[in-house]
Amino acid sequence: MDKKEVIEKIEAIVATSVNHHEFTMTEATKQEDVRAWDSLANAMIITAIEQEFGIKFKFMEMSSWKSVGDLANIVLAKVEKL
C-alpha cells in the first residue's frame, strides 16, 4: 500500500463521516478545508481509520498531524509495523 492509496481511503472515510462528497483530498488538505469536519466528525473519522487499517492511534499521534499527508504518513508507519 502506498501513500496515494492511503489518502484515497482517508478521503472516502472523511466523505462518509461528514456526509459531504464534493471535495478532492490531497496531502495538503487540512481539517478546516472540509466543510463539516468538526471535532465530532474527527472522532468518527479516527475510529473509522483505525478500523479500516487495523491500527490504533496514540493520543499524541492524533494531535500531531496538521494535514492529510501527515495523517497518511502515520497510518503508513503503523501499517508497516503490523
Explain the meaning of each model-derived region.
Residues 2-37, 41-47, 51-82:
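Phosphopantetheine-dependent thiolation modules in NRPS/PKS and related acyl-activating systems
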